[in-house]
Amino acid sequence: MRILLTNDDGIQAVGIRHLYKGLIDAGHDVLVAAPISEQSAVGHAITIASPLRVKEFVENGFRGLGVSGTPADCVKLALTTLMQDKPDLVVSGINAGANVGVDILYSGTVSAATEGALMGYPAVAVSADDFAPVDLLEQGAYVADFIAGRPWEALAPRTVLNLNFPKRPIAETLPLALCPPTQAVYNDWYVTRQDPRGRDYHWLTGVIPPEALTPDSDRALLTKGHITLTPLRFELADAAAMASLAARLGLRTDV
């Protein structure tokens, strides 16, 4: 397959390098278009007030294009401008840190895959439950095996497959679990400190309370040791809410 590969940790991150190797070793034709700098948690932001610049990276068997923008920028630019032959699949990852539950909304990794899906391409987002991974070669090979089955062919358009790996070797993981995202949200707070010039700064931290997790959710199963798979569908309107509001307000939805 011809694959567009991107991420949000940046083009020099371990995750994208090891996923690239897994895909290349499996015989795929891979074009990398990824942010030059760290873009974690930028969501689906795009750049509209400054130009995007592209730099080629060729090193240690890796070849890719670094883009001075967000993950969604990378996908949009690649699919409209950089790629002469359009891809069969958009893959984003492997992210350093899981993207489960509400993290899906914050994630540049998932948003890059979503941009691909919105533009009409099958898309897979891949993350590892480890904020400082040093070796994701096994996970990269797993992804190559996973996409060989072309699971997206059974799905509706604009669907993203969200794949997450637990922090353990592949041989020690529990079976792949198909599961919904947790509905639990973070308890957030900011740590306030002072810089060397005496000015306050604020650093976000937070946790999802374990007691708020349902046992069948992505976060709970990932923590238990499963590889998790969640299909995400980005339909912007809530059909049930449309019907409820129509009844409540006496409005028609067919005008």
UniProtKB/Swiss-Prot annotation:
One molecular function GO term is: nucleotide binding
Which keywords does the record carry? Cytoplasm, Hydrolase, Metal-binding, Nucleotide-binding
Q: Give the cofactors, semicolon-separated.
A: a divalent metal cation
> Its principal location?
cytoplasm
Q: How is the cofactor bound?
A: Binds 1 divalent metal cation per subunit.
The compartments listed are: Cytoplasm
**SUPFAM superfamilies, from UniProt?**
SurE-like
A cellular component term from Gene Ontology for this protein is:
cytoplasm
Q: What is its EC number?
A: 3.1.3.5
Which EC class is this protein assigned? hydrolase
Q: Which InterPro entries is this protein grouped with?
A: SurE, SurE-like_Pase/nucleotidase, SurE-like_sf
The entry's a divalent metal cation-binding residues are D8, D9, S40, N95
Superkingdom as given in the UniProt entry: Bacteria
Recorded hits in Pfam families, A to Z, give: SurE (PF01975)
Catalytic activity reads: a ribonucleoside 5'-phosphate + H2O = a ribonucleoside + phosphate
What is the recorded function of this protein according to its Swiss-Prot or TrEMBL entry?
Answer: Nucleotidase that shows phosphatase activity on nucleoside 5'-monophosphates.
Assigned protein family: Belongs to the SurE nucleotidase family.
Query: What NCBIfam families does the database record attribute to this sequence?
Result: surE (TIGR00087)
Protein name (database record): 5'-nucleotidase SurE
Q: Which organism is it from?
A: Solidesulfovibrio magneticus (strain ATCC 700980 / DSM 13731 / RS-1)
